[in-house]
Amino acid sequence: MVMNIRVLTPDRVICSTTADEVVLPGLTGQVGVLDGHAALITALETGLLRIKLNDKWTPIILCGGLAEIDRDRVTVLVNDVEELTDIGLSEATQELEKATLAVENAKTSKERLDASVELKKATARLEAVNYLS
């Protein structure tokens, strides 16, 4: 059985497709969704959304939001998404190291918060590269 998934930002539809399985970046960990899942609304962390169809995973980097799950339909509402570019494994690893150092060297709460968001994005980028390679 397949389910429908839509990923939306305030200004556009990122994707509208079918999926065999969806894995969402929830605030308390990953949320796996299969067809027939119980109704649920959950907050999403900045991280990697994975959509599986015909044994192929498609990653999308989300920048926070929420998801509504209802049996055979998943609607993901996010603030923004980060486009996946042709980034290699070594570049993604370097970005993760740079983001980790920025968190460690942050001097103010705002710097730490901004660096933490960038660290989450860098982690999601590295995960996405691993799924695409």
UniProtKB/Swiss-Prot annotation:
Q: Name one GO cellular component term.
A: proton-transporting ATP synthase complex
The membrane topology noted for this protein in its Swiss-Prot or TrEMBL record is: Peripheral membrane protein
Q: Highest taxon of the source?
A: Eukaryota
Where it mainly occurs, coarsely classed, is: plastid
Whether Membrane counts among this entry's keywords is yes
Sorted UniProt keywords: ATP synthesis, CF(1), Chloroplast, Hydrogen ion transport, Ion transport, Membrane, Plastid, Thylakoid, Transport
Localization annotation: Plastid, Chloroplast thylakoid membrane
Per its record, what are the GO molecular function terms? ATP binding; proton-transporting ATP synthase activity, rotational mechanism
Give the protein's function.
Produces ATP from ADP in the presence of a proton gradient across the membrane.
Its family remark reads: Belongs to the ATPase epsilon chain family.
Summary of subunit composition and partner proteins: F-type ATPases have 2 components, CF(1) - the catalytic core - and CF(0) - the membrane proton channel. CF(1) has five subunits: alpha(3), beta(3), gamma(1), delta(1), epsilon(1). CF(0) has three main subunits: a, b and c.
| Matching PANTHER family | ATP SYNTHASE DELTA/EPSILON CHAIN, ATP SYNTHASE EPSILON CHAIN, CHLOROPLASTIC
The protein's name: ATP synthase epsilon chain, chloroplastic
